[in-house]
Amino acid sequence: MASFEELIKEKSKRLEDIPLALQDAVVRQQKQVLDEISSLLNELDVKNGEIVISKANLKTISVISDDLKKVFLNEDYLKAVKKFSLEFDKQALINDKVIKAGLGTLETPIASTLYIDIAKRSAIDALIGSPIDTEFIKPIQGLLENAVVNGASLKETISSIRTFAEGNDKVDSKVLKYVKQISNDSFAVADRSYTSIVSDALQNDWFYYAGGEIDTTRCFCEERVGKNFHYKEIESWGDGKNLGDCNIGGGKWAGQIAGTNSSTIYSYLGGYNCMHSLMPISELIVSDSEKERARNLGYID
């Protein structure tokens, strides 16, 4: 049977790998989207390198939404989204193993299972529903319509759309940036919220701040990862207390998600793109120095 440390490592690795698999599918998809746009641009009337201001060109542009949506929501992308959603259930099962290894017991209330179902539906909607129209399809259509109305340079129009749809060596495309945030945050928040629901049922007092460090790890997580904390101290962070050097003013820290408080801290933790989590543990695992810190803060006798 895998140890607590081994399970934590597996769980933490998945918090990075699972969203990344979906993001890789988006990178592959961007080429198809750009090819479709290039094909559309070839149908426009152009004179001296500039797009002709005409009803015919506007009519050509007007069909782009439906065409782009078909290309964007292609079979490969839909399969990747479906696979991503199924990983929420697998992550919950791994969390069950981690909790049992850390506490020696496990109780999964029905609310935890129901929550995972809700989290999956929300993620799927964000990845294939109306937000995609708002974040990607309509902005591209807007770029093309403006190019026609203003008689813009075809070369400059193609360059602008390429940056928007495919990105470059300095910036991600608009859609990749969006999918990165949605996939990273939805998976990590679901992971933490599931654990929080189970922990509440177990009435646990101590938690291990789990996860590794990556290039984008911020001060808040960097100072806490690998340590154990009493739940009262964790909740104090949500209230803007005990932040140490990470307090950027007003009881806030860099990357903090709006709406973080003593209740939501268990789900939001370090903030946007945070891949860390709080795992319930037995007090037997907690060091004397960590208990002393909690005692000095007035959280335990």
Model-derived features: where do they sit?
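Acidic, glycine-rich two-metal-ion catalytic cores of nucleic acid-processing enzymes
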Residues: 170-286
